[in-house]
């Protein structure tokens, strides 16, 4: 692998990695979080032993980075209940279903919920308009020939974009 490729975060040194691994291995046996982290680390090492193609490794790496980012975004809202709403990105604002989605989202916000949609237009936009930007998450998947996020959620820190799903 070329080490000159641009990275979003610098790689930790071998000493830093070993230090983190030692801390993990020294965790008490009854530490559930440490046990899960050990399993994740073992799985990652098995990926190396599997001799995967470089493109497969890049997919795994990107997917893990995207998940870590999404967890950081959602973490600040752990105390809020959320409802995921699925629907067509092609539903027009004059469609009765658009209006129903808008009203439903407005009503669930009154009950203390936030909405999660794919973040595009159609039903997704109706839900985010009904809930308002402050009560909306967009979980967008980059697809060829698809539209971007709707105006309500675009450029919002609660818009999370995934390449892989």
Describe the predicted segments one by one:
Residues 2-150:
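Glycine-rich beta-alpha loop segments
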Residues 146-165:
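Conserved phosphate- and dinucleotide-binding cores of soluble alpha/beta proteins
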